[in-house]
Amino acid sequence: DDRPLLILVSQSGETADTLAALREAKRKGARILSITNVVGSSIARESDDVFYTWAGPEVAVASTKAYTTQLIAFYMVALNMAIKKGTITKEKYFEVLDELKTLSGKVESLLEDIEAEKSIAQRIKEKSSLFYLGRGADYQTALEGSLKLKEISYIFTEAFAAGELKHGTIALIEEGTPVVAIATQKDLVEKMISNIKEVKARGAYVYAITTEGETEIKKVADEVIYVPETLDLLK
């Protein structure tokens, strides 16, 4: 099949603009792969191939299950494309698959003790604004974290690419501004430490999120939340 491939994502499978894009792409000869949660939805019916996330109904206001399962779906698609194209080895392929299976257990272990997170929530709930920083894949997590906080707390919050900090962003930081700095990518920790120092020089109070075993972040951040280590591909 030499048709161009369009990958669409829609939790409901009924998103109007996504459905319009699907129909236009099909009209122009594209093959459609959709990632959706709802069996029998319009997007699922009109796609050539469907990857169901099977996340079930979203009970919380914030769409956490759908987002997480969509990420995993994208990983699975990318992994299978990579193995077919020969850009990763079979050993690496199965290593990532095996690690994927451990993620739910790691999340459960993280949720066993959330006293630190509760304490932080109590302190930031009266703040008028909060900023997230991240580099690479951590920037995408920062964007999602910012969105979730907006949706459920009604606090003004924005996420910024830490590498662009000097281009206007840092001017928003003032004394006492809470900043969440996400630094789980080992090769980017050093640069994130520099960013943390920059915002702290402006008076920010920094909550860092990093992986277990990382020792340098705590020397510059005000507080640190540790998450379980995993493959860089899955962070």
Role assignments for model-derived ranges:
Residues 15-19, 119-120, 140-144, 151-152, ...:
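Extended hydrophobic-aromatic, low-complexity segments
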Residues 1-102, 182-224, 230:
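Glycine-rich phosphate-binding loops that contact phosphosugars or nucleotide phosphates
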Residues 154, 226-227:
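A signal for specific C-terminal beta-sheet/loop modules enriched in small/flexible residues
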